[in-house]
């Protein structure tokens, strides 16, 4: 059911951080209500990229995406960037009206840059505002007790979103008391 109070959480895995030379290789999405209760999850989608794109990954990406199995999933995938965008957009539309939800996540500006370039329909569907959990992490480092949320950092898109939601709940209780 659509609600303007629902939140769109997206995480991308990419071949690197340079939006001009790197590509999206995985996308996942979760919809929560405003109290951060999960309403629905979209299965993570591995996006096909040719070998020459994967060959240009840096050492960190090669190691991490190989260890998680994502590199092989990308090679085996038949799903294009455009098809993945359409699937995620259809999922979001079921729960969130056009431009009513900020894009939510950790360091979400980086994901937003890739969405703007490679999945512009998702980028446009989200409100221009962003809810970046990393901001609260930094505020806690600067003004709080410095005790951070413990993350597993699996670098799997759906896991990363779940962790971002849990992290926001942690900081909501710790810093905001609301």
Swiss-Prot record:
GO biological process, one term: DNA metabolic process
Keyword NAD found: no
Active site location: 128
Database matches in SUPFAM superfamilies: Ribonuclease H-like
Primary location group: cytoplasm
Family named by the database record: Belongs to the oligoribonuclease family.
Name of the protein this chain belongs to: Oligoribonuclease
Record organism: Francisella tularensis subsp. holarctica (strain LVS)
Lineage of the organism: Bacteria, Pseudomonadati, Pseudomonadota, Gammaproteobacteria, Thiotrichales
């Amino acid at each position: 059911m659509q609600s303007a109070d629902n939140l769109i959480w997206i995480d991308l895995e990419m071949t690197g951080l340079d939006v001009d030379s790197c590509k999206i290789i995985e996308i996942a999405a979760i919809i929560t209500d405003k109290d951060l209760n999960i309403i629905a999850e979209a299965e993570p989608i591995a996006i096909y990229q040719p070998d020459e794109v994967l060959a240009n990954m840096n050492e960190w990406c090669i190691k991490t995406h190989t260890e998680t199995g994502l590199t092989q999933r990308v090679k085996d995938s038949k799903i294009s960037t455009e098809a993945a965008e359409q699937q995620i957009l259809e999922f979001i539309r079921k729960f969130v009206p056009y431009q009513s939800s900020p894009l939510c996540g950790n360091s979400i500006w980086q994901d937003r840059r890739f969405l703007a370039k490679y999945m512009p329909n998702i980028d446009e569907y989200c409100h221009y505002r962003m809810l970046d959990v990393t901001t609260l992490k930094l505020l806690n480092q600067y003004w709080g007790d410095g005790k951070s949320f413990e993350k597993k950092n699996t670098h799997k898109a759906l896991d990363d979103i779940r962790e971002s939601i849990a992290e926001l709940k942690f900081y909501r209780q710790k810093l905001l008391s609301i």
